[in-house]
């Protein structure tokens, strides 16, 4: 939206509207809303709809484009986004559309719309997106409404691109990272803050790449924290784990609890796997920096591991998980490898027997080192780990679940045993109520692991009360519990409560 005037025309900007849908919205409702916004068809006046297409919405967007074309064949459909920027000709949604912008669309989309409306009309269906200097891109932040500021996490970017070449990531196709001019960017952040914005998520792939810029951004938020108006501030950065010089440490250490969240991609501690996928990571520095952040700062650490990388065995992943768990980040996100269109990861398919789903999100199902059944077990484990560990709802009970036992004597395998048991009990990974989950944990620990019932019940009672749930699990039926149903807040409130539960655990 912000660039429709700058790279199109003021009139084009006036004619443009931004519309958002959820994946759950009925198809015909979306079609009706879009066609109503366009109004009736008029001779010699093209009607244009642009779609951002991603791995998570391409199926629904394909259906929507098909329905739009069926009801109004003359509408001009323009596609953009990462999912249609690679392997373009093989996709059904591309065949249904009129134009596709591959790559950056900030400049190319306004220019295309202007050409469609005023001529000369473009001859090519596939348009390579123009990558301008970042100074030529209008920052979009003044487009945010007051409702956006009050109810949403605000996505902001101080830079684009990534200099690293991790083969599973689309950013590996970038030649380098490009930084927006810092002064105008900070001015826009200041305007957002003064309008009431308090929840900022930086989408930079490598926030701590350029230390001078990183330091100025951190200082910007420290300065706001020194005022009385910064209540509720939450800032999320994605950082590379082995690059944390003293200047950044000095600034990070000044933040109070509940403000900083760092997403830290570890992906794998296996050095052979790292080399195979062109990932540069100093494991010793990574571990040292994580331990420093946990002991010397108040940052909340959301760390990532990827299961299924070429050459990673189940045992080597388990060892990496145990190593990361021992370091002690508040959250460990267990991701499953996906073959994103255009990534160099595809070069390993034959040599490592990589088998992926043919439909989005292209999740791996088996390879030469890990069979299909093990992938299915791990998929369940990852979902249960998020429910039990990452949620912070079982901080008293989790150590019992993770107690290593024969035959593997490993926290990873201990949780795998729990996940297998939970699956046998419930046959589901979604839709588990807090009460059903508490009862399943109780059954596992007392029946399968033979822990003393009184001890387990005591831990579960503390966890259940601290979680804010208000039901009555069967195993706690004789305890004094408040009633009224679980409290559900906004996503921002839930994120804050999740961090608070982890913060309490560290006290």
Regions found by a protein language model. Name each.
Residues 35, 42-45, 382-507:
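Radical SAM enzyme core and accessory elements
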Residues 139-297:
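Radical SAM [4Fe-4S] cluster-binding motif and immediate context
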Residues 1-186, 191-195:
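Acidic, low-complexity intrinsically disordered segments
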Residues 3, 7, 67-71, 96, ...:
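Alpha-helical structural signal in soluble globular domains
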Residues 113-114, 137, 214-215, 248-249, ...:
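Short aromatic-enriched loop/helix-cap "lid" or pocket-rim segments at secondary-structure transitions
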């Amino acid at each position: 939206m912000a660039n429709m005037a700058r790279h199109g025309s003021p009139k084009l900007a006036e004619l443009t509207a931004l519309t958002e849908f959820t994946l759950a919205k009925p198809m015909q409702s979306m079609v009706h809303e879009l066609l109503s916004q366009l109004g009736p068809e008029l001779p010699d006046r093209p009607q244009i709809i642009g779609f951002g297409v991603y791995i998570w919405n391409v199926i629904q967007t394909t259906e929507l484009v098909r329905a739009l074309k069926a009801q109004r064949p003359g509408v001009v459909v323009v596609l953009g986004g990462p999912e249609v920027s690679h392997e373009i000709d093989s996709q059904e949604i591309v065949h249904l559309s009129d134009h596709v912008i591959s790559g950056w669309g900030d400049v190319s989309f306004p220019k295309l719309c202007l050409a469609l409306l005023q001529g000369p009309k473009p001859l090519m269906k596939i348009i390579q997106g123009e990558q301008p200097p970042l100074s030529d891109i209008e920052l979009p932040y003044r487009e945010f409404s007051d409702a956006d500021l009050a109810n949403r996490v605000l996505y902001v970017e101080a830079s684009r691109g990534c200099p690293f070449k991790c083969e599973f990531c689309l950013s590996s196709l970038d030649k380098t990272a490009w930084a927006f001019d810092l002064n105008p960017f900070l001015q826009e952040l200041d305007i957002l803050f003064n309008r009431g914005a308090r929840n900022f998520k930086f989408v930079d792939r490598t926030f701590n790449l350029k230390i001078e810029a990183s330091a100025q951004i951190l200082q910007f938020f420290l300065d706001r924290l020194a005022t009385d108006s910064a209540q509720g501030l939450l800032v999320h950065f994605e950082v590379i784990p082995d690059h944390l010089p003293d200047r950044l440490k000095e600034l990070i250490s000044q933040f109070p609890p509940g403000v900083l969240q760092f997403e830290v991609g570890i992906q794998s501690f296996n050095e052979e796997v790292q080399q195979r996928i062109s990932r540069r990571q100093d494991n010793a520095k990574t571990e040292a920096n994580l331990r420093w952040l946990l002991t010397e700062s108040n940052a909340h650490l959301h760390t990532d591991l990827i299961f299924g990388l070429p050459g990673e065995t189940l045992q080597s992943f388990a060892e990496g998980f145990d190593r990361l768990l021992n370091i002690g980040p508040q959250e460990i996100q267990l991701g499953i490898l996906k073959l994103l269109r255009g990534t160099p990861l595809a070069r390993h398919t034959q040599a490592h027997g990589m088998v992926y789903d043919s439909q989005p999100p292209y999740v791996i199902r088996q390879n030469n080192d890990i069979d299909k059944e093990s992938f299915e077990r791990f998929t369940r484990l990852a979902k249960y780990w998020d429910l039990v560990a990452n949620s912070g709802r079982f901080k008293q009970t989790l150590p019992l679940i993770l107690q290593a036992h024969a035959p593997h004597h490993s926290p990873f395998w201990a949780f795998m045993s729990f996940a297998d048991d939970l699956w046998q009990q419930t046959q589901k990974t979604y839709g588990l109520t807090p009460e059903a989950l508490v009862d399943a944990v109780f059954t596992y620990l007392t029946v399968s692991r033979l822990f003393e019932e009184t001890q387990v019940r005591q831990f579960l009672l503390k966890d259940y009360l601290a979680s804010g749930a208000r039901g009555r699990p069967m195993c706690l039926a004789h305890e004094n519990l408040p009633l009224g149903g679980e409290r559900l807040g906004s996503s921002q409130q839930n994120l804050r409560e999740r961090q608070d539960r982890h913060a309490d655990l560290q006290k």
